[in-house]
Amino acid sequence: AYAGGPVGAYADYRLVPAERLLKLPDQISFSQAAAMMLQGLTVHYLFEKLHRLQSGDTILFHAAAGGVGLIACQWAKALGVTMIGTVGSAEKAELALANGCSHVINYKTENFVHRLRELTQGQGVPVVYDSVGKDTFEGSLDCLQPRGLMVSFGNASGAVPPFSLSELASRGSLFITRPTLAHYTAQREELVAGANSLFGKVLAGQLHIHVKQQYALNQVIQAHRDMEARITTGSSILLTE
């Protein structure tokens, strides 16, 4: 199995450097691996490397019912972290809660900044994880405590517009980072350690991998349409046979 790597995954065969490959445990299927390697290693570096979460912490995590989000829900629960997640439908809210998310905010029906402030008694949270980008960026900053950390790790709604660094000062001496998985698994040792942590949680029953949508390789256009319409939940995979 592998995560990331060179562009060109929409193919029957790939050429991947041997040092980027990982041996799957016998108990984990190829379909599970396809649905968890990129997503699970992303959660590992977000929660265990970039900013090590501790039991009792409270966080905001956008897109809590997506492929990364559902793993994050379960990982946060295993760590004893209170996770406040945002979703775009009642169905997705139920799914996130069922996977361990402590509180869910439906951004279609609620102002997520106001609701988070209510849930935290006006304090905000020390860390926000935002893979949505343009649509949520300003609100995410408003959810942070003074000296809080904004982790912008995706831009599903579009790139974040340019902004002045002085805004970070005026909002409470905030920190911001734009990480990628590649920089947290650049060394073979880092990749193996992250994979072992992920595999261990799956085999221990702490993580259940949701392969929610499966498409034949010739259905890739429909797969993109479904994701762009935000009607998917969990992970989507392409099947080559």
Regions found by a protein language model. Give the residues of each.
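Terminal helix/beta-alpha structural elements that buttress the NAD(P)+-binding lobe
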Residues: 1-241
